[in-house]
Structure formats: structure tokens, C-alpha cells
Curated annotation (Swiss-Prot):
SUPFAM superfamilies named among the record's database cross-references: Trimeric LpxA-like enzymes
Reactions that this protein is recorded to catalyse: (S)-2,3,4,5-tetrahydrodipicolinate + acetyl-CoA + H2O = L-2-acetamido-6-oxoheptanedioate + CoA
GO MF annotation terms: tetrahydrodipicolinate N-acetyltransferase activity
Protein name according to UniProt: 2,3,4,5-tetrahydropyridine-2,6-dicarboxylate N-acetyltransferase
GO biological process, one term: diaminopimelate biosynthetic process
Length: 241
């Protein structure tokens, strides 16, 4: 099994793809077992419960063999699982200094900055970075190695393209204080400059200069960010921290 360490080159999409291909695939399950059965805890099985009821954690193939071997002793059982042949585990979020809402999916090797907010249904892929005080709104997608700066808002349903499929050596970068409207799409390799605003529903195919507003399909510069725009797009600090 190949483990992608902190020293591995996440800038190379082919290295990430190799890791995914060669990583040991996992189908972890949780089994609730009722019956007169003795289950010994091993390196492959984690067991809780009492004489006639057990909760067992392990890989699907191991747990299924256990159930088949003790079929005559089991009255009822139920299996719960949420993935199949998964190559990348989810990020351990329990000690992050950020707000992570239920239903967010954040894969391993992601960096989440202080006071960031990840809303329900957001998906953040391997190698992405979310800066301090930034919000990834509901159902937004941050692709592999997407770089999100500080004080950024990525609107609901927006898509920040990743470096995988099609492979790209250059990640999408949103610099500090950028606002991306709902359902906008930022394509591979695009850099959105400091303080820029991407209007809702736009498709951004080329770099966006700092402090500009872009809109449309494909997105074009429509104005320079002014005081009125800053007022309409300012972040709410009470939602952070």
C-alpha cells in the first residue's frame, strides 16, 4: 500500500492519481448482531456489547465471514456502510479550529484554516486548502488542490475545478477577499485576483484581475469593484469564529 505523506508532491496530478490507484481500498462496515455468539476482538475487528448483542466494526469481507461462520447462532443482524472500495479516507475534523456543518465531505490531505466555515453538502477534495475566515457554502465543490485564500466566500453550488481529470499542473487559486457567487464555475488553472467578485452563474475560463467584477458565460469584466460592490459583498463576521 502506498501512503501519501506530507512530503509527497501534491502539485503533480499524476502522483495523486497513482496514490488513489495503488492505495488499499476500504469498505468499512458497522454490524449490529443479536444472538448467542462469542466474538473475539482482533486487529481486524473492533467489538462492543454484551452476551447477546454485539456491535462490530471492520472491513466488509471480514465481517461477512464472521456472520457466515456463526449463522446458526445469530438471530438478527444489520450492516451499515457509507462507502465502497474507498481509496481516500475522510479528514479527521474533530480538533479543527473551524466550523464544519453536518453533511460536509472533506477528504484527507485537506488544510482548513482558522475560523473557516464549511456548510452542509460542501465537498472538498484531496489536497485543497481553505484559508482563514473563508466560507464554503452549501453544495459547493472544491476540486483537488483548489487553493482558497483568506476571507473568501464560495457561494452555494459553485464549482472550483480540481487538477484531476482532466489533469492540470496548475490548481485553481482564489486569492484573499474573493467572492464567488452561487452556481459559478471556475475552470482548471484559473487564478482569481485579490478582492475580485465572480457573479452568480458565471463560467470563468481565464484569470480574473484583482478588484474586478466578472459575469457571464464565459465570464468577462463588467466593472471595477467600488464601494457599493464592497458593501453588497462584505462578509458577516458573526458567522465566523
Amino acid at each position: 500500500m502506498i501512503i501519501l505523506s506530507t512530503n509527497d508532491n501534491l502539485t503533480n496530478p499524476y502522483e495523486i492519481a497513482r496514490y488513489i490507484k495503488e492505495a488499499k481500498k476500504s469498505t468499512p462496515v458497522r454490524a449490529y448482531i443479536q444472538g448467542n455468539i462469542e466474538i473475539e476482538e482482533t486487529e481486524e475487528l473492533e467489538v462492543y456489547g454484551c452476551d447477546n448483542f454485539k456491535i462490530v466494526f471492520g472491513e466488509l469481507d471480514v465481517v461477512e465471514k464472521l456472520i457466515e461462520a456463526n449463522e446458526d447462532k445469530i438471530k438478527h443482524y444489520r450492516l451499515e456502510y457509507d462507502r465502497r472500495n474507498s481509496a481516500i479516507p475522510l479528514l479527521d475534523i474533530k480538533h479543527l479550529d473551524a466550523r464544519i456543518e453536518p453533511g460536509a465531505i472533506i477528504r484527507d490531505k485537506v488544510k482548513i484554516g482558522k475560523n473557516a466555515v464549511i456548510m452542509m453538502g460542501a465537498v472538498i477534495n484531496i489536497g485543497a486548502e481553505i484559508g482563514e475566515n473563508s466560507m464554503i457554502d452549501m453544495n459547493a465543490v472544491i476540486g483537488a488542490r483548489g487553493i482558497i485564500g483568506k476571507n473568501v466566500h464560495v457561494g452555494a453550488g459553485a464549482v472550483i475545478a480540481g487538477v484531476l481529470e482532466p489533469p492540470s499542473s496548475v490548481p485553481v487559486v482564489l486569492e484573499d477577499n474573493v467572492l464567488v457567487g452561487a452556481n459559478a464555475v471556475i475552470l482548471e488553472g484559473v487564478r482569481v485576483g485579490h478582492g475580485a467578485v465572480v457573479a452568480a452563474g458565471s463560467v470563468v475560463t481565464e484569470d480574473v484581475p484583482p478588484n474586478t467584477v466578472v459575469a457571464g458565460v464565459p465570464a468577462k469584466i463588467v466593472k471595477i469593484v467600488d464601494d457599493k460592490t464592497r458593501e453588497k459583498t462584505k462578509l458577516m463576521e458573526d458567522l465566523r469564529g
